[in-house]
Amino acid sequence: MDLSTLEQKLTEMISAPVAALGYELVGIEFIRSRQSTLRIYIDSEDGITVDDCADVSHQVSAVLDVEDPITVAYNLEVSSPGLERPLFTAAHYLHFVGEEVAVVLRMAVQNRRKWLGVIKAVDGEMITITVEGKDEVFALSNIQKANLVPHF
């Protein structure tokens, strides 16, 4: 099973239990390595505490133990999205129009995979980012990773 299919299956599997606890499932990442990690990002209107993460971890662990979708050993991490919030869906980009974002593409555009710019617009599955005064349009399916860039 390829990584995006696994992440999609995991998202479908744990969305309801996370929502039942009163949290939004922001997204998940599965990082394959010698010590693989399943990272789950949650949020709520009141913010996220360590106890919230522990509650979700306990609930999700129970679901994953029964369903057993991951065939390798892994560590489970549950956290808030944090200041460098990852963006997973078109709705996330739409919510953060006007914010600076760092994007890594699956396939290079204009010989570049890494882009830094401001989210300008979202049209279906197409994301427009203003980079150095020029609008660049990327398919959401070509975005491997995107994070907000915090300013202090």
From Swiss-Prot:
Gene3D superfamilies the record matches: Ribosome maturation factor RimP, C-terminal domain, RimP-like superfamily, N-terminal
Keywords for this protein: Cytoplasm, Ribosome biogenesis
Localisation: Cytoplasm
SUPFAM superfamilies registered for this protein in UniProt: YhbC-like, C-terminal domain, YhbC-like, N-terminal domain
CC annotations in GO: cytosol
A single GO BP: translation
Domain of life: Bacteria
Disulfide cysteine pairs (residue numbers): none
HAMAP family: RimP
NCBIfam families: PRK00092.1-1
Function, in words: Required for maturation of 30S ribosomal subunits.
PANTHER family: RIBOSOME MATURATION FACTOR RIMP
Family: Belongs to the RimP family.
Official protein name in the record: Ribosome maturation factor RimP
